[in-house]
């Protein structure tokens, strides 16, 4: 069973994810249909970042997954050599 702290952290992560999803959805899907002179545009980054930010996040994710897999494989190889 999860402790109270785990539940609070989980709820916080869900809340942050929901806020990011709502912001990004409004930015990418709704904003192009609103007049460019409308005041709401000042609350959003330029459209070029709508592609650049997720691309950079995806590349960082792939980098960390690759590093983790490499680390685990090298560690397993060392343990196997010591056992022999």
Swiss-Prot record:
Pathway: Protein modification; protein glycosylation
InterPro entries (alphabetical): DPM2
Subunit: Component of the dolichol-phosphate mannose (DPM) synthase complex composed of DPM1, DPM2 and DPM3; in the complex interacts directly with DPM3. Component of the glycosylphosphatidylinositol-N-acetylglucosaminyltransferase (GPI-GnT) complex composed at least by PIGA, PIGC, PIGH, PIGP, PIGQ, PIGY and DPM2. Interacts with PIGA, PIGC and PIGQ.
Entry GO MF terms: enzyme activator activity; enzyme regulator activity
Alphabetic keyword roster: Congenital disorder of glycosylation, Congenital muscular dystrophy, Disease variant, Dystroglycanopathy, Endoplasmic reticulum, Membrane, Transmembrane, Transmembrane helix
Disease: Congenital disorder of glycosylation 1U: A form of congenital disorder of glycosylation, a multisystem disorder caused by a defect in glycoprotein biosynthesis and characterized by under-glycosylated serum glycoproteins. Congenital disorders of glycosylation result in a wide variety of clinical features, such as defects in the nervous system development, psychomotor retardation, dysmorphic features, hypotonia, coagulation disorders, and immunodeficiency.
Function (record text): Regulates the biosynthesis of dolichol phosphate-mannose. Regulatory subunit of the dolichol-phosphate mannose (DPM) synthase complex; essential for the ER localization and stable expression of DPM1. Part of the glycosylphosphatidylinositol-N-acetylglucosaminyltransferase (GPI-GnT) complex that catalyzes the transfer of N-acetylglucosamine from UDP-N-acetylglucosamine to phosphatidylinositol and participates in the first step of GPI biosynthesis. May act by regulating the GPI-GNT complex.
Lipid bilayer topology: Multi-pass membrane protein
GO cellular-component term (any): endoplasmic reticulum membrane
Organism expressing this protein natively: Homo sapiens
Intracellular or extracellular location(s): Endoplasmic reticulum membrane
Pfam families registered for this protein in UniProt: DPM2 (PF07297)
Any one of the GO BP annotations: protein glycosylation
Name of protein: Dolichol phosphate-mannose biosynthesis regulatory protein
Family: Belongs to the DPM2 family.
Transmembrane segments: 11-31, 49-69
